[in-house]
């Protein structure tokens, strides 16, 4: 796992020493709720929720301003989904990151989004502040989608 997380550092911070990269990886593991000793285990040894935390660690180790998350809570049980959502919200506040969050799970979107774009057949049919879209959808497709999913 250490090597997976370190990969981006080697490419984007080529002048960082091995020790600096090592410390950054361990710090990032702790930030996503994993223990330092987990750095030396293999991915197949982790649960689905832990693997998702590792994926998040890989993405945030470089402290990006924008993070694109494609279905980050799919295939996780509801309890673990809640933990991952809380982690993402905490990291967003800590690092002032913007998320582009792609999901079919409207409950998760409602919990995370400030701004929503609803797509139908690959095109945006409605967009605006999340509260506005969820409370008063204007487009028939959006209304049907919310009625079916919420």
Which positions does each model-derived feature cover?
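Conserved ABC ATPase signature
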Residues: 42-46, 50
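A short, surface-exposed alpha-helical micro-motif characterized by mixed small hydrophobic
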Residues: 109-111
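A short, proline-enriched helix->beta-strand linker immediately N-terminal to the Walker B motif
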Residues: 61-65
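Hydrophobic anchor residue at the start of the ABC signature
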Residues: 56, 84
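Short, glycine/charged-rich "phosphate-handling" switch motifs in NTP-dependent
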Residues: 115, 127
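Conserved ABC ATPase "signature" region
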Residues: 19-37, 146-147
